[in-house]
Regions:
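Active-site helix of classical SDR
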Residues: 87, 129
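Residue(s) in the substrate-gating loop at a strand-loop-helix junction
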Residues: 113
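The beta1-alpha1 cofactor-binding region of Rossmann-like NAD(H)/NADP(H)-dependent oxidoreductases
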Residues: 5-6, 26-37, 69
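Substrate-binding pocket helix/loop in short-chain dehydrogenase/reductase
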Residues: 63-64, 71-76
């Protein structure tokens, strides 16, 4: 829940000005009851539920050795529980509709991050939450397919109220344009549409630089099981020599900064 609901109401006003129908909800989506009210409000207002976009978030960036318990808990609660709670109540609604014999073509679109997929210094709390959302997306897609619901995620890079003070500010109008949320909206809109019915369990990177599919964890080099820890050194070294290097924040192999010991 944000402290200022006026941006949400502003969007409502814009939608209504174009002839659409909208309603703002100020409940805390990381609370069980608040998330339930959110879903009920949508169903009561529009008569049905077609898509849920989980996009609430906060930042409490800090190096691990300096991070407080409150900074950890706050980020995990808003991002991770704030994705689970609305999704859970939406899933129950669609399950009940399906069991009642009614047609269901539902969508859940979650918000992950390249920080959660690839890792970014100073964001153990945020990255852990966003990685959790990516895994949540994969598992929820398997569970909800039987009810006619797809679950995907978007890992965006854009300037918003949350990120505008994160990192160097764009120096030119072209750089600002490249980080505009307008590059994120199309993939979210498409995933919410009927055209995306065959796509589920995926994470899409989206920015002014690229639209890509993050392919997730895959098993790399293997070795037969070893039951003696004193013999593991050479085995691990051999596997590491064949393994792909971790991707960096740009998603490319080998661009992840290698840890340095002083």
């Amino acid at each position: 829940k944000g402290g200022d609901e006026s941006p949400a109401q502003q969007v409502v006003n814009e939608i209504e000005a174009m002839g659409g129908k909208a309603i703002a909800n100020g409940d805390d989506i990381s609370s069980w009851d608040g998330a339930e009210r959110l879903i009920k409000t949508a169903v009561e207002t529009f008569g049905d539920l077609h898509a849920v976009v989980n996009n609430a978030g906060i930042l409490r960036d800090r190096m691990l050795a300096n991070m407080s318990e409150e900074e950890w808990d706050a980020v995990i609660k808003v991002h991770l529980k704030g994705t689970f709670a609305p999704s859970r109540h939406a899933a129950a609604y669609w399950r009940d509709q399906s069991k009642a014999g009614k047609p269901v073509d539902g969508r859940i679109i979650n918000t992950s991050s390249v920080s959660g997929i690839y890792g970014n210094v100073g964001q153990t709390n945020y990255g852990a939450a966003k990685a959790g959302i990516a895994a949540f997306t994969t598992i929820a897609s398997l569970e909800l397919a039987r009810y006619g619901v797809t679950v995907n995620a978007v890992a965006p890079v854009a300037l918003t109220r949350m990120t505008e003070n994160l990192g160097p500010a764009p120096e030119t109008e072209a750089e600002r344009e490249q980080r505009s949320p307008k590059w994120i909206a199309p993939i979210v809109t498409w995933l919410a549409s009927t055209e995306s019915a065959g796509i589920t369990g995926r994470v899409f990177e989206a920015s002014g630089d690229v639209l890509a599919i993050a392919e997730g964890w895959h098993r790399g080099p293997t070795h037969k099981p070893v039951d003696d820890p004193t013999k593991l050194g050479p085995v691990v070294e051999e596997m590491m020599s064949k393994a792909r290097l971790n991707a960096g924040m740009d998603g490319r192999d080998g661009t992840w900064p290698q840890p340095q010991k002083k």
